[in-house]
UniProtKB/Swiss-Prot annotation:
It comes from Thermoplasma volcanium (strain ATCC 51530 / DSM 4299 / JCM 9571 / NBRC 15438 / GSS1). This is Ribonuclease Z. Zn(2+) 2 binds at D68, H69, D209, H267. Its cofactor is Zn(2+). It comes from the Archaea.
Amino acid sequence: MASNIKIVFFGTGGSWPTPIRAMPGVGIQIDDVFNLFDCGEGTQKQIMKSKWSFMSIDNIFITHFHGDHFLGLIGLVQSMSFNNRTKDLNIFGPRGAIGIISNAINIGYYTLRFRINVYELEPDKTYDLGKFLLKTTLNDHPVPALSYTIEEKDIIRVDPQKAKELGIPSKIIEKIRDNGTYEYRGRKYSIDEISGGIRKGRKIVYTGDTKPMQKMADFAKHADVLIHDTTTDSSFEPAVNQFGHSSAKQAARIARDAGVSRLFLYHYSPRITDVSPLVDDARAEFQESYASEDLMEYEVKVKH
């Protein structure tokens, strides 16, 4: 069956927190698997304002180790311990993650009550994480930094007429789809016997901080959702590019070239209070551009 995929923007600002925006943190829930992308200062408090529980987080993916993207880990991990978490927590990041995260989670006096598994990921790799595939690429930022893609695995469509002709009930169809074959009433059925083609899995791309780069358009090709660094409007492009960031117009060009379904503007400069000029800039290049806001939720619908 198709998974339920939801995105929650816990924080959409960059550099430092403001009264209207929290630091970067994006939740992507795939059924009962909770993934957090970046964990800036105050992320746990933002999670408390949402429908999520910070105790349910399974995986945390850090794009890079500038403070606005990971300093929230310190408080989050300690709060998990105070609340008697026992299940493992997986934390992923670019080169240097093991040392930096080890230092962060060992600040201060507390008892760590659960196992933390830290993984350093290589760029341009694909990792099978069960419910989904995680893909990485090196982006253009002054420090080691990765962009991530979550890809739902392709799903085999079932032809109901074929299943009906074979006398296979719906509960058995799912077992055949999950296992490839399944024995029912003394006969082994194959998925090929009831297949109606392939439904491509949904794809979400989270860039983290990056200058615009053509490689990102290839990385985000035909994504359902692209969440791209849009630090400012086009009038400040030279300045933000110098520090490894993108403007809204540049992000929209990437979205257009990639052929994505929807672009979310993200990681606004703390000097920006009104994002409407950024949306206008972006929509001049790519109409399906939208401003993300703190605690906004978005459901990624199934492709038909």
